[in-house]
Design a protein with these regions (language model features):
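Catalytic cores of DNA base-excision repair glycosylases
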Residues: 3-240
Length: 241
């Protein structure tokens, strides 16, 4: 999102060690931000397996997003119930679709909702697109960044539970920095070409090694760069924020 992104020396070493350990994952965006937005809403507070099932059931039951928008909410609930919190997520999805419809009508657009959202994001910078998504009902900073990164290959860095925890332990950010604040910090220090691989590798590391409880420090490739075990001094490595 920023014009100039300068990683700290500590982050450079962390990035290189993560790549050595987990490789350099490549993004394969589908350029369907509306599908990605709905999918991200469905993924909240559930497993990938359950959210994928809910998404497939939703698009099988309702062929278009206009159909989802116009359907009785209880029918949406029925379609996505396998993903959990269906009563909440159904309303959020329809609220987003109705808001996009209102914007579309105000502009006199006749494209599909999927095309409308794609065009709205395409004509904006990454930062502007992130702010635009944040203004949609129920869309937080992580959801907005996920859509931009995964679906459009934009350099927006989502901060999920794993990324937040691992980043604090490594000393990339301060221990009191919230996930919302971390979005802005990573925006300043992560080069665009690093965004996707760093995000994916931090999640991988959080799932495999740096668990919330009983992290496997004796198996950690980042042991030499970790504030949690005292290998680095947080005051010298964290970015102010």
């Amino acid at each position: 999102m920023s014009i100039t992104r300068r990683p700290t020396n500590h982050l450079v070493r962390v990035y290189e060690l993560l790549v050595q350990t987990y490789g350099t994952p490549k993004n394969e965006p589908d350029y369907d931000p509306l599908g990605g937005l709905v999918g991200t809403i469905l993924s909240q507070h559930t497993s990938d397996i359950n959210s994928d099932r809910a998404y497939k059931q939703l698009v099988t039951t309702f062929p278009t997003w206009e159909d989802v928008r116009d359907a009785p909410t209880n029918k949406i609930v029925e379609a996505i119930k396998c993903g959990g919190l269906a009563n909440i997520k159904s309303v959020r999805i329809q609220d987003v679709l109705c808001t996009l419809t209102e914007q579309q009508q105000e502009q006199g657009e006749t494209n599909t909702l999927a095309e409308f959202l794609y065009n709205e994001l395409a004509r904006r910078t990454t930062k502007e697109a992130w702010r635009y998504l944040r203004e949609l009902p129920g869309v937080g900073p992580k959801t907005a960044a996920c859509v931009l990164m995964f679906n459009l290959d934009r350099p927006a860095f989502p901060i999920d539970t794993h990324v937040h925890r691992v980043s604090k332990r490594l000393g990339l950010i301060g221990t009191r920095v919230s996930a919302d604040q971390a979005h802005n910090i990573f925006d300043e220090i992560v080069p665009p070409e690093w965004v996707y691989p760093l995000h994916v590798n931090l999640i991988q590391h959080g799932r495999q090694i740096c668990h919330a409880q009983r992290p496997k420090c004796n198996q950690c490739a980042l042991f030499s760069e970790c504030a949690y075990v005292g290998s680095v001094i947080p005051q010298e490595t964290v970015v102010p924020g």
